[in-house]
């Protein structure tokens, strides 16, 4: 799975409304418009959505490699810095290290130029 069309076809990303703006190894950029059906009881973008975006950005960066056929997230960490109450969310993912069947990546999530969250993850490649 390494073509842009295959990445876009992800049912989960479709459900969230994610737009894959760029996916060229070792980087990706995803976009998501804030919507009421993605918020928590306080009216801000749900933390699980943010974690999903962080994971998806790094996953798209990895899967855009010709050599990577599939991935499994083995660890995911997200640091949250501020709430998202409206606007367009941009996530930039990057593969930082890849060796053998393991890869590590980072992603930065922004809303209107403000850093909202920073995430890192480890992946098993196959």
Features from the language model and the residues they span:
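Terminal targeting signals and extreme-terminal segments of soluble enzymes
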Residues: 1-126
């Amino acid at each position: 799975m390494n073509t842009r069309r295959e990445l876009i076809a992800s049912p989960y990303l479709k459900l969230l409304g994610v737009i894959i703006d760029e996916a060229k190894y070792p980087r990706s950029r995803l976009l998501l418009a804030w919507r009421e059906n993605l918020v928590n009881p306080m009216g801000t973008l749900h933390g699980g959505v943010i974690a999903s975006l962080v994971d998806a950005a790094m996953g798209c960066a990895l899967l855009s490699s010709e050599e990577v056929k599939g991935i499994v997230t083995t660890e995911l960490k997200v640091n949250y810095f501020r709430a998202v109450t409206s606007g367009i969310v941009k996530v930039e993912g990057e593969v930082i290290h890849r060796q053998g069947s393991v890869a590590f990546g980072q992603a930065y999530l922004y809303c209107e130029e403000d850093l909202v969250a920073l995430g890192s993850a480890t992946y098993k490649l196959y």
